[in-house]
């Protein structure tokens, strides 16, 4: 969302950290990305973007659930009909015919979705990493897929974001912000 989602708190955080730098293994961090919520676990950059960034490793977050009630849009869901999924896949050139089934076919070690398989009347297609999130226009790779069958509708439940440095982790138990080292 970039600067469109900025507010008094984010502006204050930027001002308070002006002139500070992040280092990982003695080198300046080239890409620092942050999230406000990870849904319970972050994810390795390799499992999302396909490139290994040493300081972007997946970890279970034992604290996220404790603050979930105050995180806007922590849990949300959407529903796709088989017809809508068929259109999405055909628009991407996957050509599997009419979608008959959609399911999570692989999870990462932290419980995020690694791949989703769509089965249609003319074949199957497995979509992996970031592509499965963007295909379904989801906020993260921490989602579940349910439904299908006779109702011919698939519900998708999503929580948090996946790959980044936690903005919440930058605040200690007293509420004082602290620098992130990346190690």
What are the roles of these predicted feature ranges?
Residues 1-183:
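Conserved, single-site charged/polar hotspot
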């Amino acid at each position: 969302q970039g600067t469109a989602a900025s507010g008094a708190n984010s502006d204050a955080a930027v001002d308070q950290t002006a002139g500070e730098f992040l280092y990982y293994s003695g080198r300046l961090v080239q890409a620092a990305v942050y999230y406000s919520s990870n849904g319970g676990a972050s994810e390795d950059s390799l499992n999302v973007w396909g490139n290994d960034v040493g300081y972007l490793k997946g970890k279970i977050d034992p604290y996220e659930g404790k603050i979930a009630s105050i995180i806007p849009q922590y849990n949300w869901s959407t529903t796709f009909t088989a017809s809508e999924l068929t259109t999405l896949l055909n628009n991407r050139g996957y050509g599997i015919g009419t979608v008959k089934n959609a399911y999570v076919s692989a999870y990462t070690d932290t419980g995020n979705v690694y791949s989703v398989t769509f089965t249609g009347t003319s074949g199957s297609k497995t979509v992996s990493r970031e592509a499965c999130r963007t295909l379904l226009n989801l906020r993260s790779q921490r989602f579940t897929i349910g439904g299908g069958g006779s109702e011919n509708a698939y519900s998708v439940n999503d929580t948090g974001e996946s790959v980044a440095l936690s903005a919440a982790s930058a605040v200690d138990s007293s509420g004082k912000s602290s620098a992130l080292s990346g190690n």
